[in-house]
């Protein structure tokens, strides 16, 4: 199909674009139009661009063209279906943690990133298209490019799962119809139910970090701590195993936001390890489970008897404990125990997750490029989850995942949250236009401010004393981006005088850049 464009039917201050491949459009046309109409009814004129996209360059050209339209500038876009995936090389310093020798397999040593599309100031050299994964297009960040991220628009991915027994186009249709339905049914939904859940071995182990985050959230989202709202902080070692408690929380039909802090893989949320115990019997059980796994693995290489003998001597434990690794009954028991430790995509496929927005502060959970992935599994089920944010590669623990999260209560679209606190690997998976109704400071349109007054020093100077700390913090970011000549003095003053944690933290962060 030749490129086909449907233009916005509403004149709005800014616009949005749905970029979709030809097959997905034909298979899900009515659902796509329902989604477009729901976005337009929400005050955002919407383009649809349909094509058999041969490379990312054509898409980026369209986005830049629409963004430069002064009458209705583009504020964001979503990539629906099989849209080319930029695989970025020579830019590892723009990730939070990813470091890999680029001599390794290019699929593993490149970063899947839509910063290629949404950050117009980054410049790239095209390298090649992957011979096996036809959607993968490799780019090298030019040495002449700017060296920091400052996306001009927000973007998101709606790429249905490709799993056995499911038609990906049917999954796409059902998701788009769901979003259209909920945008209409919940147009007055405010952010008044939030849950944070932590997994083991992460910065979750630091009680100081845990306490500090709660203090910051109270400052960013004060209405959550009032009489008519609910906020929960769940800990991996309070509920053991935590899996069922966390899944129950994810299925809560009232839940607005679910924040996860844990380790992750494309198909796994890691929640628990062996339980910290002090009793003798419980400690022996932990040791035995450890031995069963180690002995079974070593036996594949050296045989059962040799593996049993090795670990019995190495760890000074009875051989009988080691030999249990080959008992089918114990193998099944250990397997069930291990399955209860973590959340897998196979669990989510059977459930209805309802948290409207889920943030994964975890490695790999946002791997939209994988056929099956955690973020997509929260979206493509019969629940009410609309949007997620996650990373396509590993993630640093010592970062600020909640930066600007207080602006969600003012109606900020989740796409803008990722635009201003994301890394090279960070992506919205789902509808990036999703937002809550502003019940905090009606009259201040944060989305229009971030689009029409981006880097507008005069406008943001007027927001420095805004009653909401996160608006003040955003004002500091915008002034820094604008090149305001007295930025350093202003940041120093704010750090020394502000009563708000998040404002001081934003000032300190910007001073360090």
Question: Where are the regions that the model predicts?
Answer:
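Cysteine-dependent hydrolase recognition
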Residues: 1-513
């Amino acid at each position: 199909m030749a490129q086909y464009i449907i233009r916005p039917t509403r004149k709005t201050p800014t616009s949005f674009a749905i970029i979709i491949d030809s097959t997905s459009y034909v298979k899900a046309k009515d659902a796509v139009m329902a989604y477009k109409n729901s976005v337009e009814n929400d005050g955002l004129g919407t383009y649809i661009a349909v094509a058999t996209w041969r490379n990312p360059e054509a898409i980026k050209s369209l986005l830049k063209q629409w963004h430069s339209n002064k009458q209705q500038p583009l504020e964001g876009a979503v990539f629906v279906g099989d849209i080319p995936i930029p695989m970025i090389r020579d830019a590892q310093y723009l990730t939070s943690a990813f470091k890999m020798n680029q001599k390794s397999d290019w699929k593993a040593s490149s970063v899947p990133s839509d910063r290629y599309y949404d950050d117009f100031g980054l410049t790239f050299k095209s390298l090649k298209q992957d011979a096996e994964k036809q959607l993968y297009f490799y780019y090298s960040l030019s040495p002449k490019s700017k060296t920091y991220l400052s996306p001009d628009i927000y973007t998101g991915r709606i790429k249905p799962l490709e799993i056995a027994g499911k038609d990906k186009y049917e999954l796409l249709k059902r998701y788009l119809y769901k979003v259209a339905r909920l945008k209409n049914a919940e147009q007055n939904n405010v952010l008044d139910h939030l849950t944070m859940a932590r997994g083991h071995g992460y910065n979750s182990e630091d009680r100081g970090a845990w306490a500090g985050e709660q203090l910051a959230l109270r400052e960013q989202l004060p209405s959550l701590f009032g009489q008519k709202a609910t906020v929960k902080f769940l800990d991996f070692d309070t509920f053991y195993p935590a899996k069922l408690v966390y899944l129950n929380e994810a299925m809560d039909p009232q839940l607005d936001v679910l924040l996860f802090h844990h380790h992750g893989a494309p198909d796994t949320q890691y929640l628990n390890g062996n339980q910290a115990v002090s009793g003798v019997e419980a400690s022996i059980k932990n040791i035995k489970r450890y031995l069963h796994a180690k002995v079974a693995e070593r036996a594949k290489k050296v045989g059962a008897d040799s593996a049993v003998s090795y670990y019995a001597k190495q760890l000074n434990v009875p051989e009988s404990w080691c030999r249990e690794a080959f008992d089918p009954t114990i193998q099944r028991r250990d397997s069930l125990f291990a399955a209860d430790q973590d959340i897998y995509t196979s669990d989510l496929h059977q459930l209805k997750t309802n948290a409207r927005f889920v943030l994964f502060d975890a490695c790999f959970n946002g791997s939209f490029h994988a056929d099956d992935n955690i973020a997509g599994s929260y979206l493509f089920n019969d629940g009410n989850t609309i949007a997620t944010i996650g990373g396509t590669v590993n993630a640093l623990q010592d970062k600020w995942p909640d930066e600007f999260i207080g602006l969600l209560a003012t109606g900020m679209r989740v796409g803008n949250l990722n635009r201003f606190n994301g890394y090279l690997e960070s992506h919205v998976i789902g509808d990036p236009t999703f937002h809550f109704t502003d019940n905090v400071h009606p009259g201040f349109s944060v989305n229009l401010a971030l689009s029409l007054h981006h880097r507008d020093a005069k406008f943001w100077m007027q927001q420095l004393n805004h009653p909401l700390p996160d608006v003040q913090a955003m004002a500091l970011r915008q002034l820094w981006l604008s090149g305001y000549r007295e930025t350093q003095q202003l940041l120093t003053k704010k750090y020394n005088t502000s009563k708000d944690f998040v404002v001081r933290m934003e000032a300190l962060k910007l001073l360090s850049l």
